[in-house]
Amino acid sequence: MKILQVITSLHTGGAETLVVNLVPRLRAMGNTVDVCLFNGEETALMRRLRNENPGIHVWTLGHGYYNPLYIIKLARIMRHYDIVHTHNSSPQLFVAIASLFSRTRLCTTEHNTSNRKRQWKWYAPIESWMYGRYGHIICISKIAEEKLREYMGGAWTDRRSRRYSKITTVNNGVDVEAVRHATPDDVLLRAKAGRTAVVMVAGFREAKDQDTVVRALSLLGGDDFEVWFAGVGVRQTVVSEMAVSLGVADRVRFLGMRTDVPRVLKAADIIVMSSHWEGLSLSNIEGMSAGRPFIASDVNGLREVTKGYGLLFPEGDAAALAALLTRLRADAAFYQSVAESCYGRARQYDIKDTAAKYDDVYRALMEE
């Protein structure tokens, strides 16, 4: 099959990482897989994609995300492929419109349980039309599927309807063993100097809650812990200013955009994901793969993977997070038990299984 993955960009993020992880595995199954980017800016993930996939064609439409001229370009490009698979909002909509001028089969992945558009009631009919153009809609977790059906309503919730069967769940996956056996970053190992290092890998954006991690650090006192934030984004300045105001700036490290996340995870002692909402976080699964205890906010998209394996704290509850961090540092047996349980859970979300299920979806579409 000739498959085109369409996404906004290859800046670091969950959907972007999933695409880069999927491409070589789908190619190994005998498929031709190319990528189309709305914003073709050179990034670390772009370089990795090219290095791991000799001969791949990367189509770049421009440098923005919402240029309507992209629809014309997409209509021309799509004719070269059997399957076009979209990720993120603007590619979903623009490809749906472009499909009016192409017979290519369409698939999309819904990566979130919530977004701002779902608060716009007037937009729901547009999304219903858009999703109706797709032969299949993959949700990255069961809760993401439930929330999408709830939002769409109508035939999307009626088991007798053709539209109902268009939506299925394929859990996100990561290369679990690559994370497990990564070499810790030497610079970070030396820098923590006996402190317990708590790392959160996430962009500084609306859905993420680095603020609670900083507040938890301020409650711990002493000099036993430090926090590492790997990622960039519009809220980084806010979080940095909070660290200063709470008197913990000397124990918070902003690592910036990292292309060696497994090495960062292995250098840390505890891994945290503090969020307001998620789809199914790849950082969640990566964190649980590292052989370290994983702590997450008790919210949709994190709860489903973490509960019963890692540790959960109420959303925004810095005191509860601080208490869990304290116990993990003080109780070696508890620390080891949680770490082993997390790794066992992560193995249920291996990228090999994700790729095989995506391939099954594509083959089913080809038979329709």
Q: Could you say what each language-model-derived stretch is?
A:
Residues 86-94, 110:
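Short His-centered aromatic/hydrophobic patch
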